[in-house]
């Protein structure tokens, strides 16, 4: 930017020499222009104080992304249990973003007053969601087990002799008796807690 400024000459001009000052006779007053240059290239541009909603949406990152970024930066400054709790809240926020609608997550972030309150709020919401999933999972599991039991239950009568195939399978599944086991069977006495099989079950 170029500006033009007019300066007037002195009535008594003074000339400077190495040895003495010499004053010249008075000249007539006359004016001459002086050119001055000023540049505004290095001056930073300030943002407008009143930005529109559309401008903020275009320039600012989404609320959830901004909260995640601030939370990760805050967690990087912590140590120990505080750092663990902060990072757990960060991943809980990620889980909420996947499972819940975007509006609900944004309302949750707006309702909190800061990062510390956001961490506590995320822990509370995550614990409630975990309890609900556990209860619902147990309920569904019990119902499914009951239905499976009703569908797959087959009545097996007791007291019937085993078939030859079942007896062969039992004999094959048994481990071979050691010499000590055979000695106990032949010489040992029956303990008090042992009872013989009823007569109708013996062949």
Swiss-Prot record:
Required for the development of the one-cell zygote and endosperm in embryos. Required for micropylar pollen tube guidance, but has no effect on ovule development and gametophytic cell fate specification. May connect transcription factors and the Pol II machinery to regulate pollen tube attraction, via its interactions with AGAMOUS-like (AGL) transcription factors, MEE14/CCG and the Mediator complex. Keywords: Cytoplasm, Nucleus. Residues 156-178 are annotated as: Disordered. This is CCG-binding protein 1. GO terms for cellular component: chloroplast; cytosol; nucleus. Homotetramer. Interacts with MEE12/CCG, MED7A, MED7B, MED9, AGL49, AGL53, AGL75, AGL80, AGL81, AGL82, AGL103 and NRPB1 (via CTD). Its main location: nucleus.
